[in-house]
């Protein structure tokens, strides 16, 4: 949803291909893409669609790199609580970029509360004042039932993501093993969120056509990587925010599809 918003406001999105660095942004990639026209950089960790996240040392190096530029850092940390190995490191932990940083989060992923549409924005006071003014004329406020649900989640359900993550890890491990047996390749191990982003290069390069055929013939829904920009061509995104029984049935159907169409 970020691309149309940027374009609507007259901006030009510039994409960084991270496929060669295990889908992780690096200081070198940042330096290659920032110009005197750059106004902001938008980051998302743990990441949709790859499930990749950053270590504390990686976040710190990136923060130090970005502190050299007079640009805003917009970091979408909506999947922060869905970090599997170790503690999520927020860009907000580094004081030297706080005047540049806008941090986005919410309850949609951490508490599976996609329906209540409650989000949070943190940033320097001078920016929040202006953004609050804009927000007031766009949606006025969050509805009261959603606010009540949010309060309950924050007061009584802070441990909920821990239990959810245990299930996500089990499902991820199952999918990693099963997909590799079926001939898919993984360029990076997902360590957060609830997505896996395998390559279909052993079968075809047309990810869109592949997903359409799997949907029509096997009745399994996956997202073509190219829907996340052209840099995702040749990959597919699979969500494991489902019960294990559903995932296993989906893999059985996918296996039958591959046998029928690719003679595996």
Q: Which role fits each region the language model picked out?
A:
Residues 1-264:
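PLP-dependent class I/II
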């Amino acid at each position: 949803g970020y691309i149309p918003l940027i374009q609507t406001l007259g901006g030009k999105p510039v994409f960084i291909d991270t496929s060669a660095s295990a889908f992780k942004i690096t200081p070198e990639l940042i330096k290659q893409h920032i110009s005197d026209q750059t106004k902001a950089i938008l980051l998302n960790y743990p990441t949709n669609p790859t499930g990749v996240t950053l270590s504390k040392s990686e976040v710190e190096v990136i923060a130090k790199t970005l502190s050299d530029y007079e640009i805003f850092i917009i970091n979408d940390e909506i999947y922060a609580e869905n970090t599997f190995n170790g503690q999520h490191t927020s860009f907000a932990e580094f004081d030297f970029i706080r005047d540049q940083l806008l941090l986005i989060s919410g309850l949609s992923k951490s508490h599976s509360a996609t329906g209540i549409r409650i989000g949070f924005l943190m940033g320097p006071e001078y920016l929040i004042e202006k953004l609050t003014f804009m927000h007031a004329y766009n949606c006025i406020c969050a509805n009261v039932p959603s606010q009540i649900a949010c309060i309950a989640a924050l007061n009584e359900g802070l441990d909920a993501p821990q239990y959810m993550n245990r299930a996500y890890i089990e499902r991820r491990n199952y999918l990693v093993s099963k997909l590799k047996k079926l001939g898919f390749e993984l360029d990076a191990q997902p360590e957060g969120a609830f997505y896996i982003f395998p390559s279909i290069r052993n079968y075809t390069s047309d990810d869109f056509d592949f997903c359409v055929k799997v949907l029509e013939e096997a009745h399994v829904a996956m997202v073509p990587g190219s829907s996340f920009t052209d840099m995702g061509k040749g990959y597919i995104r699979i969500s494991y925010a489902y019960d294990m029984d559903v995932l296993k049935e989906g893999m059985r159907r996918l296996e039958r599809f591959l046998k029928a169409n690719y003679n595996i």
